[in-house]
Amino acid sequence: MATKTDFLAILQTMAGRDVDYIVVGGVAAVLQGAPVATFDLDLVHSREPENLNRLLAALDFLEARYRTLGAETARPTYSHLVSPGHQLLMTRWGPLDLLGTIGEAQGYSELLDRTVTLDAGQDLSVQVLDLSTLIQLKEQLANDKDRAILPILRRTLEEKGKGS
């Protein structure tokens, strides 16, 4: 579906529909200066009813479909998005992972006070999970991919601390 990955276009679509979300994962790390590569955009979204309706409108515009084998034509529904689970989607502008919760069942409301507002480009401000919380979550997950990136995230946090 996606011919070119454009995470900024996905974020602009969400902002244009007033979707409440927090950027987590690799894009959150990159926005905070970590020199890492990422292949998808991870968002923890608010599961409040009004927000889910706005999110569904954004996903419709993005032509979002599940990217799991055999489900490539399935679209996310309200009942999918209200769950605490992960929705692994492909959009017109690349892979998007929508997370009801992360870590130890932490959702949008629980994480909001652990975010920073950052400029994502083109006058778009986004809520991003702060680097220390991102590190804590990666330590909890403890899979090979997360363990590999931890030294880079810690070093970035250390460098940011020196610059403050």
Residue ranges and their predicted role:
Residues 1-164:
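Compositionally biased terminal segments of proteins
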